[in-house]
From Swiss-Prot:
GO molecular function: structural constituent of ribosome
Source organism, top-level taxon: Bacteria
Subunit structure, as described in the record: Part of the 50S ribosomal subunit. Contacts protein L32.
InterPro entries per record: Ribosomal_bL17, Ribosomal_bL17_sf
UniProt record similarity statement: Belongs to the bacterial ribosomal protein bL17 family.
Protein name as catalogued: Large ribosomal subunit protein bL17
Gene assigned in the entry: rplQ
Keyword Ribonucleoprotein part of the UniProt annotation: yes
Length: 116
């Protein structure tokens, strides 16, 4: 039984789900906003906020953890350079999820997730 299991399955095996979330996190940090399904946006929010919190910490160990997660190494360095200035006064809540119109093909709930 999956009582109180907080990991959303997203209809994929574990390795595919982790790779998808890594890719979405990388894209969100690079572009600032991503259009995806609502369930993926909610799962992405946790990962993106974890990476921004690591960047705010700014230690070498945090930087290495972020490099191991985010696909683009230069993007990690850019995130660590500007995270303290941009999010220094915030204690979480670095992203915003905005619901949009359903997807035309399968009527899936869509959302835009963006960095605040």
């Amino acid at each position: 039984m999956r009582h109180q299991c907080r990991v959303p399955k997203l209809g994929r095996p574990t390795d595919q789900r982790k790779a998808m979330l890594r890719g979405l996190t990388t894209q969100l940090i690079r572009e600032g906003r991503v259009t995806t399904t609502k369930a993926r946006a909610k799962a992405l929010r946790d990962e993106a906020e974890r990476m921004i919190t690591l960047a705010k910490n700014g230690s070498l160990a945090s930087r290495r953890r972020a490099i191991g997660y985010i696909y683009d190494k230069q993007l990690v360095h850019a995130l660590f350079d500007k995270a303290q200035d941009r999010y220094g006064d915030r204690q979480g809540g670095y992203t915003r999820i905005i619901r949009t119109v359903p997807r035309r093909g399968d009527n899936a709930e869509m959302a835009i997730i963006e960095l605040v």
